[in-house]
């Protein structure tokens, strides 16, 4: 706990800076310089990789999208969880974030991660190709959230899960009701809710194809 307190203080200051940077009409992603805000023991304590992997129901062989992956706090443990035949696509709109991740992948000799430089809503993901998609502290940074939801619906296999995790204190925090309004029109159905304050997760399923 003693190690968490300094990170909490730094986090509050950092989030305030991010908030000032985002006092504009359009959302912007977290700058690479402030990536540590979402890659530190404080965040791990409330939204750790093991906890989110459990909420996602990860299993070997799955294909997963870590959308807005940043420097890879979740990408790397998720890649290990889906080994040996699974794959994680690490998607981020910022090349600098992906470079941080690629250095970590090389250092740990992880080969089942594919990085993809693109924003949500740009339709860069393959159709009906993934079992799980994760949005952790990301949705509020997306400029067109409804378009992003449609893209992710198309990218998931029927029966696949979109998991949205949000944390109070994030300058782009989205309330559960807001998330549902932005995600469900794409065709998703809410199937699970975990946590509450300060961090919650909503799991949405793409329904199975109806028999004809």
Question: What are these regions, as identified by a protein language model?
Answer:
Residues 2-59:
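Class I SAM-dependent transferase core
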Residues 65-67, 71-123:
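Class I SAM-dependent methyltransferase SAM/SAH-binding core
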Residues 82-83, 142-143, 156-158:
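Helix-to-beta-strand junctions that scaffold the AdoMet/dcAdoMet cofactor pocket
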Residues 121-133:
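A short acidic, Gly/Pro-enriched loop at the edge of an enzyme's catalytic core
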Residues 131-144:
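A short SAM/SAH-binding and catalytic strip from SAM-dependent methyltransferases
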Residues 146-161:
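A short glycine-rich, Lys/Arg-flanked "PGG" loop and its adjoining helix->strand segment in the class I
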Residues 163-186:
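Conserved class I S-adenosyl-L-methionine
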Residues 186, 195-212:
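Core SAM-dependent methyltransferase catalytic element
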């Amino acid at each position: 706990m003693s190690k968490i307190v300094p990170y909490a203080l730094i986090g509050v200051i950092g989030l305030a800076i991010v908030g000032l940077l985002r006092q504009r009409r359009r959302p912007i992603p977290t700058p690479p310089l402030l990536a540590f805000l979402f890659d530190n023991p404080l965040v791990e304590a409330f939204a750790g990789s093991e906890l989110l992997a459990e909420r996602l129901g990860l299993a070997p062989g799955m294909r997963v999208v870590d959308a807005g992956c940043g420097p890879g706090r979740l990408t790397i443990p998720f890649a290990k969880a889906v080994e040996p035949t699974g794959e994680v696509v690490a998607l981020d709109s910022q090349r600098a974030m992906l470079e941080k991740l690629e250095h970590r992948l090389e250092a740990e000799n992880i080969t089942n991660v594919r990085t993809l430089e693109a924003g949500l809503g740009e339709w860069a993901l393959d159709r009906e190709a993934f079992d799980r998609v994760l949005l952790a502290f990301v949705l509020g940074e997306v400029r067109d959230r409804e378009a992003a939801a449609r893209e992710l619906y198309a990218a998931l296999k029927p029966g696949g899960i979109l998991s949205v995790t949000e944390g109070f204190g994030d300058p782009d925090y989205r309330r559960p009701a807001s998330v549902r309004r932005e995600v469900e029109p794409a065709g998703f159905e809410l199937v699970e809710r975990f946590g509450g304050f300060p961090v919650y997760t909503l799991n949405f399923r793409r329904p199975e194809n109806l028999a004809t």
